[in-house]
C-alpha cells in the first residue's frame, strides 16, 4: 500500500502556480560556488564525528498502584563510582518519596539521608526546560543498588525518569550511521564503550558491554525495542570487537526518539550501564529525478543554468531544497577532445563545487554555474556532476544522491572567448548581486540583536550597550535554521544594510542567511565584523536529544529541533563554505573552574555535558572552523538563570561587539 501511495504521488501532475512558491522569490537565493580544494568540506559529514559520548543513564519510571492504595516503582541503579549523582524528573510534583537499598547489606535508606547534597533544579535549553531533584553522593558503595519511588495515595505524576550520572571514566559512544532518514528506509545506529572521547584499545579486547538495545519512540508515541549485536552482521564491523549495531524501519514521518541502552561490567568489576538519547527526523520521499542527466544552458555572458528534471508530489512545490554538487570537466586539449564520454573518464578534472537553496519551478530544480570556473580549470564543455545531493532545507536530509551525473551543455557563455585574469571574484562565489532600487532597499543602517531557540528577551536589558541597534523579537519559537534566517532577513529589510550580534541558535541562523540568501548583510560595509555570535552550538548540543526523550513524557515544550542535535548540525555544516564562515566572529564561555569546589553553570545539564561548557553547549561544539575565534571567557553561562551571569549581560564584550560591528 505504501509503495502504491508513493508511486501515485510521484505521478500526480505538478501544479506550479502556487502562492507559496512565488513568495519565496523575494528571498533572492545566492548561487554558491568554490574551488576544488573545498570539495571535502562540502561533502556529507562523517557520522562518527557527531557521536555522543554519554556518562549518564536515563531510566524511565512508571508508578503502579499497590494493594494498600499507594503507588510504587523500583529499578536497578548501577553505581560504578563512589562519586555519583542522580536526578528524578516528575514534572514538578513533590510527592515522590525516593529510597535506596544498599547492594551489600540490603538495608534501605532514604535518598536524602545518604546524599551529601539535594537541590531542586531545571534541565533544558533556553525556555524549554523541565524541573527535577538532584541527589549527589561522595562516598557511595559501588554495585547494583535498588532505587524505590513511592507515593502515599495517588501520585501527582505517574510517569517520569531517573537520570543517573557517574564520574567513572568509562563512557558510551553512539551515533547514527546513515543520512537517508526517509519513510521506508532503515535507520542504523552503532554503539561502543569509550573513555575520554577516545575508544581505548583494551576496551575493544575487554568489551564492557554485554548487552545493547534501542528503545525507539515513534512519532505517534508508540514504542518498540530493537536488539543491537556485536556479531559482524549488523553494520558493526567485526564480530566481538566491542562495537554493537542495530537498525529499525522508519514507517512514519515525523520525529523519532532513539535511546541506546548498553549494560555490562567495567574492567574494575563495577557495573556498566549507560544510555544516550538521539532525536531523528524522518521525512517523505517527495521528489525523484525525472532523468539521469542534468542539462545546462547559457543565461548571461558569464553564467550557465543547470536544470534537474524532477518528479514530485503536490507538497514538494511548497518546499525549499538545498542542492550541492561538484562540477568536473574534460581537460581542454585537442587530443582528449576527440574522445567519447566513456573514453574521457580518466581525463576528467575538478572545476568547482556549486550549491543553492531553491524550490521547484516547472518540474525543475535549478542551480547556476559561473563559467569562469571552467576557464580557471582549463576544461572543455564536456562536463559532469559528481557527489550530487538534493536535500530538504529544514533538516538537510538527502532525498536524491548521485555519485556521477552527465551534464549536457547546450552552449557556453560568451565569456569563454574573452580574456579572464584567473582571479576568483565575489560574483563567482555568490552569484550575481541584486541591484538595490528605491523600491527594494530600506533606509539607513542598523545592528540587529538576534536571540536563539525558544528564547526570552536575552538582549533587551542590555540593548543600551549597543549603539544604533534594533532587537529581533521572535521569542519562544522553535524553527529551523532556514526559516530563522528568512525571518531575520525580513526583519532587517527595513534598513539598507545591517550587521548581526547573535546569541545561541541565532548565530547559526545568521550564518545560514549570509550563506544562502541576499540580504542587508551583503550591503554592510562599515565596521569590521559582519556576524558576531555568543554561545552558538555550531556543532549542536547533546541536550537536544535528551530534551526529546523527556518531552515524550512531559510534553514537548517549544518542540524538538533537529538542527540543534549533533548529527543535524553536522549535516547543516556540510554545506557552509569557507568564504561564508570567514564572516563570523564567535565567542564561547563556561563556568569558572576552581579545583577546591564543584563548579557548574547548570546542575542538571552538567550531568550530560563535557567540561568546559556554558550549561547548554560544550566549548568544542561551539567552535567554527574558518571563522574567527574571539576567545573563551570563564565565569559566564548560557542564560541569565544559571549559576553565573548570562553571556548576553557581559558589558565589556557587548561594548566591544558594538564598536566592531558592521551596520
Describe each model-derived feature in a short phrase.
Residues 91-95, 180-183, 195-210, 311-323:
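A short beta-turn/strand-edge loop motif at beta-sheet boundaries
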